[in-house]
Design a protein with these regions (language model features):
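Active-site histidine-anchored catalytic micro-motif
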Residues: 1-168
Length: 168
């Protein structure tokens, strides 16, 4: 369970204390599992959470997926109870590959940038500007550059810069 606050805990008006208590309350619940963010009275799947506000107490939203639960008056109200569907044993990773590059595609970006990154990175996250299509500029081909990465055993994944409705 991950939490935080928009205001420091030592201030008179803060969300830190309630977020901390809510996160402990949820983490100790027998139906809690997986990676979750507890913030602003909501429990959000860690894989779906996005910080959308820099000052508001409801800073995080669940993108294209319902909140797992809400915490109100010290009570947890579950909207999703999928603990029984979690069949894999818990596995902890103590080391992570930090040679992953996030590339936000923009109109007119040259696909050769992927060639320049290949020697320095083991993985690539491409953020497209729509439902997941790759730009096509004729003589420089994004698909061919991605093929070079995957042929070299590197991981490439695609996402979207658009917050709602996902990618294809």
């Amino acid at each position: 369970v991950i939490t935080g606050a928009q205001k420091p805990i030592d201030l008179a008006i803060t969300d830190a204390r309630s977020n901390l208590l809510d996160s402990l309350r949820f983490a100790s619940h027998d139906r809690a599992h997986g990676i979750s963010i507890v913030f602003g009275g909501k429990v959000i799947a860690g894989t779906r959470a996005k910080k959308e506000f820099s000052k508001s107490y409801n800073a995080f939203s669940s993108i294209n997926y319902p909140d797992i639960a809400v915490i109100h008056d010290d009570r947890i109200v579950f909207y999703i109870d999928d603990k029984e569907q979690s069949t894999k044993l818990l596995q902890f990773y103590h080391a992570m590959d930090d040679r992953i590059f996030l590339l936000k595609l923009i109109p007119s970006i040259n696909p050769l940038v992927l060639e320049n990154l290949a020697d320095s990175y083991d993985g690539l996250i491409l953020e497209s500007f729509g439902v997941g299509g790759l730009p096509d500029y004729g003589n420089h081909d994004f698909a061919a550059m991605i093929e070079k990465w995957t042929s070299a055993g590197k991981l490439v994944t695609m996402s979207t810069q658009v917050t709602h409705e996902g990618s294809d």
